[in-house]
Amino acid sequence: MAAIRMGKLTTMPAGLIYASVSVHAAKQEESKKQLVKPEQLPIYTAPPLQSKYVEEQPGHLQMGFASIRTATGCYIGWCKGVYVFVKNGIMDTVQFGKDAYVYLKNPPRDFLPKMGVITVSGLAGLVSARKGSKFKKITYPLGLATLGATVCYPVQSVIIAKVTAKKVYATSQQIFGAVKSLWTKSSKEESLPKPKEKTKLGSSSEIEVPAKTTHVLKHSVPLPTELSSEAKTKSESTSGATQFMPDPKLMDHGQSHPEDIDMYSTRS
């Protein structure tokens, strides 16, 4: 029993010491955590060091819609063009019918005689080309009908003729320009040599140039006697100037002796 009491007495102080040590360590950790200042707190989250932008890849549904759109785009554009053309044609014909109805409802006095002249001229063309070819059967009635229309309506016929002449001239100029451009392109292509021939010519010229220079150097022309004598005198004078040596006795060394030339600076 005495031993048990001694054990209890020894274990209780050890437990108290351990508890005090753990509490002290926790307090130290809390104090360390509270030492951070508000200015040092991060406002934003730090971005990753190795970031890379990756585009979103389209899915199967998007690829299918894109292929359908590209396949049907040209057909849709063609259908739109046809629809606009037909719509404009229908609107023009309806407007022409309305104008014709208004005009025929209250026609002028000379309308019926003029129409009679035009129809009679067309029938005359049919009768004259009755036994002819198909070309005559088409051209004769149209030609005589247009002739009657020009006689009956001269002002309108002149305006129509001017407009058609301008259109024909513009189209002819466009055709002429296109043909001329094609002709000039073909002529330029024919006139220009091939690049291989150019390289051959360049190499041959490069090889022949030194031969020509050597050939020119070989054929020397004799100079006249006067020029040769002048050249000789010039060469002699230059050689004499280079070979001239001054007399050391005549040289002025100042106050120094000629023997001490290495020790003092001389005057020239």
From Swiss-Prot:
A biological-process GO annotation:
cristae formation
Which stretches are tagged as biased composition: Basic and acidic residues?
187-200, 249-260
The main location class comes to: mitochondrion
Q: Which InterPro entries match?
A: MIC26/MIC27, MIC26/MIC27_animal
Query: Phosphoserine: which positions carry it?
Result: S204
Bridged cysteine pairs (disulfide): none
Residue segments, region Disordered? 187-268
What is stated as this protein's family in its record? Belongs to the apolipoprotein O/MICOS complex subunit Mic27 family.
Q: What does this protein do?
A: Component of the MICOS complex, a large protein complex of the mitochondrial inner membrane that plays crucial roles in the maintenance of crista junctions, inner membrane architecture, and formation of contact sites to the outer membrane. Specifically binds to cardiolipin (in vitro) but not to the precursor lipid phosphatidylglycerol. Plays a crucial role in crista junction formation and mitochondrial function,.
What is this protein called in UniProt?
A: MICOS complex subunit MIC27
Question: What gene name is given for the protein in this entry?
Answer: APOOL
